[in-house]
Structures are given as structure tokens and as C-alpha cells.
A protein has these predicted regions:
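N-terminal low-complexity, Pro/Thr/Ser-rich intrinsically disordered segments
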Residues: 3-20
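Asparagine-centered strand-capping/turn motif at beta-strand->loop junctions
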Residues: 102-106
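Short acidic-glycine-tyrosine-enriched beta hairpin
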Residues: 72-96
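C-terminal partner/receptor-binding element of secreted or periplasmic proteins
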Residues: 107-119
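Residue-level recognition of short, solvent-exposed, well-ordered loop/turn junctions
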Residues: 41, 60, 84-86
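A short glycine-rich, His/Asp/Glu-containing loop-to-beta-strand
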Residues: 20-47, 52-57, 112-115
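Short, conserved beta-strand element in jelly-roll/cupin
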Residues: 50-71
């Protein structure tokens, strides 16, 4: 998989585990993959960040959430029911370069394991 134009220092600083280390824990990394444990507690907001590579995501727990772009515009409300995200779901996503934030507006933790495909 190709990396999404994140070769300069500014772009690298917006990578999820760098921009929001309290929400992204790297469990394993080599030259081909990176495995990340993603957690967002109730009421927490993950600051603006990007996803450098295509991913395979496993949802462990889910709560209602909002996703916003870099201007604060609402891009996704999980309560709309149009998302593949549900507990136990596995889904793929392309690299996601636009800056976005995630706000947990529910009562439970959002937690998932992400396998990022570097090549």
C-alpha cells in the first residue's frame, strides 16, 4: 500500500500515534505493518490526525461518536446508522489523509485494533 503524502515533518506529526498518543498505542511495528490499539473514553476527543496507510480494523467496543474535519465541520455521526462500525466488526479502510478528529459522545469506551498495511 502506498503511503499518503506524509513525508514531511508536519504530516508525520499528524500521524495518529504521534498526534494522539493517549489514544493510539503501537503494539507492533516493522517495515510492512503497524498494529495499533485505539481507545477513546467517554467524553474524550481524539485531536486532529490522519491515517498514513490502508488499514484492517477490528472493533472491540463501540460507543456513539462524532467525526469532524479540520474546520470543525461534522463529517460523521455514528447515530445515523450508516457505518460499518459495530462491536465485533472487521472492515478495511483506505489511507485517510484528511485531518479529522473523533469525539466519543457515548457512555462506553471506543476500542479497536488496527493493522496498518505499509506496502
Amino acid at each position: 500500500m502506498k503511503e499518503n503524502n506524509t513525508t514531511d515533518e508536519t504530516a508525520l506529526s499528524l500521524d495518529g500515534p504521534v498526534a494522539a498518543p493517549q489514544h493510539h498505542t503501537v503494539l507492533f511495528e516493522n517495515d510492512r505493518i503497524r498494529v495499533v490499539d485505539f481507545r477513546v473514553g467517554p467524553g474524550d476527543t481524539v485531536p486532529l490526525h490522519t491515517h498514513r496507510w490502508a488499514t484492517v480494523n477490528y472493533v472491540i467496543t463501540l460507543s456513539d461518536f462524532l467525526s469532524r474535519d479540520s474546520d470543525g465541520n461534522l463529517k460523521h455521526d455514528s447515530r445515523d446508522g450508516d457505518s460499518p462500525q459495530r462491536e465485533g466488526a472487521v472492515f478495511c479502510m483506505p489511507a485517510f489523509p484528511p485531518l479529522h478528529s473523533v469525539e466519543n459522545i457515548g457512555c462506553g469506551e471506543i476500542r479497536g485494533i488496527t493493522v496498518e498495511l505499509k506496502d
